[in-house]
Design a protein with these regions (language model features):
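Long, low-complexity segments enriched in small/aliphatic residues
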Residues: 1-53
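Long, contiguous, secondary-structure-rich segments that constitute the structural scaffold
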Residues: 40-63, 67-153
Length: 153
């Protein structure tokens, strides 16, 4: 009989950027069918179709579990400062029961500074707040995520 034998690997646990005591939340991004998540901006008609749980006027929203928001004294539609080791941005709070406690979720495809007045300065560019998480064994990117904090503005 053939047996597959894999070598024993002493892999380290993957660590997100940022001290968890200073940045107690985990920030991840989400994609939307209505927004281009790449370098190109979304067409204006798609921006009009974006839900108001993602973008209100020019303010980008983040999803956070009501329990987590409550511990921080934050409520629906309140403005907060989202800070990571890589940067900070003003965001609006959207309470979402579907978001895991301790997590903050931000939409991809917003925060462009070009592409005309209709797309520029709408929401937050998540790329300025987070970076790749490298697998210590292979050096390859494993996930998007970073430690973060939210504070009332």
């Amino acid at each position: 009989s053939l047996r597959l034998r894999l070598p024993k690997i002493d892999a380290k646990e993957i660590q997100l950027e940022g001290n968890i005591k200073e940045y107690p939340l985990i920030l991840i991004s989400k994609s939307s069918m209505r927004l281009s998540s790449g370098a190109a901006g979304s067409p204006p008609f798609m921006i009009k179709a974006v839900e108001d749980t993602v973008l209100k006027k020019n303010m980008g929203l983040v999803d956070i579990h009501p329990q987590t928001a409550g511990k921080m004294g934050l409520g629906e539609d309140e403005t907060a400062l989202l800070t990571t080791p890589r940067g900070a941005a003003e965001v609006m709070i959207h309470l979402d029961e579907g978001t895991m406690p301790g997590m903050v979720v931000i939409s991809q495809g917003l925060g462009h500074t070009a592409y005309g007045a209709y797309l520029a300065d709408k929401g937050v560019n998540f790329n300025q707040l987070m970076g790749p998480v490298k697998d210590p064994l292979t050096g390859q990117n494993t996930a998007w995520g970073i430690n973060a904090k939210l504070s009332k503005v």
